[in-house]
């Protein structure tokens, strides 16, 4: 195998927009993310309501055949 062809790994601090942070290994020393396991609805069990009724009405209004 060839030597010195792989990127150098350093300890990386990953920070989420919710304030959660954790350590990982990466080529960069710092990363910022928008969503993590502490604030993602799948992991927290909370649901986010989506206004699908408004979208359906808008679709029907746009493509209504008179």
UniProtKB/Swiss-Prot annotation:
UniProt cofactor note: Binds 1 zinc ion per subunit.
UniProt cross-references to InterPro entries, sorted A to Z: Ribosomal_bL28/bL31-like_sf, Ribosomal_bL31, Ribosomal_bL31_A, Ribosomal_bL31_sf
Cellular component, GO, one term: ribosome
GO terms (BP aspect): translation
Entry similarity comment: Belongs to the bacterial ribosomal protein bL31 family. Type A subfamily.
Subunit-structure text: Part of the 50S ribosomal subunit.
The protein's name in its UniProt record: Large ribosomal subunit protein bL31
């Amino acid at each position: 195998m060839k030597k010195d062809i792989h990127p150098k790994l350093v300890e990386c601090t990953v920070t989420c927009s919710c304030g959660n942070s954790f350590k990982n290994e990466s080529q960069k020393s710092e990363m910022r993310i928008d969503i993590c396991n502490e604030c993602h609805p799948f992991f927290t069990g909370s649901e986010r309501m989506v206004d699908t009724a408004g979208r359906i009405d808008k679709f029907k209004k746009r493509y209504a055949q008179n």
